[in-house]
């Protein structure tokens, strides 16, 4: 019979970093063509909307040190916030080609897909919510006006 040994360990102390959840809506499927960024302070529930990715980045950096989570963020959202060159040079936590975290100017950009390896619609259903439908013009890349409906979708 095999024996296993379990060693107890205490949880790490909280870092005190503010945690944000964010999402981007883009013109088509081009991550660099950000039209809307919505974020929520996980601790306070305060929501913010930005129509300029550089303003969002400045907001996060103004709250540094902090952690910003996006679902599929390492493969999409972060590329609309930080340039490829900056990401390449940034300290990162990775395993092979999977990047778990980029750190830029005191902001740790993390991907929730590594914590919840599901499609966003599956995550929503698991907590009895609906993901909602991406407005078609955002998929097609034909957005001509930012509507409240699109902002509400981004904040879901």
Label every PLM stretch briefly.
Residues 13-14, 31, 62:
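Intrinsically disordered, low-complexity regulatory regions enriched in Ser/Pro/Gly/Thr
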Residues 24-31:
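Short acidic, Gly/Ser-rich segments with clustered Asp/Glu that frequently serve as metal-coordination loops
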Residues 19, 38-146, 156:
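Conserved DEDDh/DEDDy metal-dependent 3′-5′ exonuclease domain
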Residues 32-37:
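Extended non-globular scaffold/tether segments
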Residues 1-20, 24:
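N-terminal accessory regions of nucleic-acid-interacting proteins
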Residues 150-154:
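Flexible, low-complexity linker/tail segments at the boundary of structured domains
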């Amino acid at each position: 019979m095999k024996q296993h040994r379990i060693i107890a360990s205490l949880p790490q102390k909280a870092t005190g970093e503010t945690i944000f959840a964010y999402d981007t809506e883009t013109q088509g499927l081009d991550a660099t063509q950000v039209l809307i960024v919505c974020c929520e302070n996980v601790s306070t529930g305060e929501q913010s909307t930005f129509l300029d990715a550089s303003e969002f980045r400045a907001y996060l950096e103004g709250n540094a040190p902090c952690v910003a989570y996006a679902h599929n963020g390492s493969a999409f959202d972060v590329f609309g916030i930080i340039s490829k060159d900056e990401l390449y040079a940034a300290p990162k936590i990775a395993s092979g080609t999977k990047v778990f975290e980029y750190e830029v100017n005191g902001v740790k950009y993390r991907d929730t897909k590594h914590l919840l390896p599901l499609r966003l619609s599956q995550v929503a259903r698991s907590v009895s919510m609906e993901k909602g439908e991406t407005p078609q013009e955002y998929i097609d890349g034909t957005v001509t006006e930012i509507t409240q409906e699109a902002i509400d979708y981004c904040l879901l």
